[in-house]
Amino acid sequence: ILCIVDDTIASKTKPSSKAIHPMEAANFHFSHLKRKQDYGHQAVGVLLSCNGITLNYTMIMYDKSVSKIDTVKQIAEEIPTAPTSSYLLCDSWYVCEKVVNAFICKGFHTVGALKTNRILYPYGTKMNVCEFAGKLIEAKCRELFHLVTVKGRKYYVYRYEGNLNGIENAVVL
């Protein structure tokens, strides 16, 4: 079972102040896609996918009085416990202690991007991902890396197993 979480903005053409018939609950939100403020409704969507069937589990209008993290955490608490090996798919925004641990309680492992400022504890030493990657490159220990080819491009991948801030026994590639 895959649980897919993402947020989006349904853009509107005019702000309420300029519209003849103002749109209720529309607001300005930062669009990472457009890299600027965008006027419209922002929603957090959750899809469940299993055996080729994908269903909309919920779509919640974003309310600025409650963070997106808390909204997704609440969804995780309400979602049924996974009966089989299951995964949460999300972007780096949602890969945080509250969300990951809430989904772990429901039997979901998390697959998502990790921000470079995320804290790891390699060999018990606290450092961010960017710092740790630099140390691995400095060490020039090729045997620590696995060469992976994706669409003809080659990447060196390192597997970290250990703790993140507030998340135990994580695997980071």
Located regions from the model:
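Single, function-defining residue in the core of a domain
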Residues: 1, 12-17, 51-173
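Active-site-proximal, Lys/Arg-enriched surface segment
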Residues: 1-51, 153-154, 158
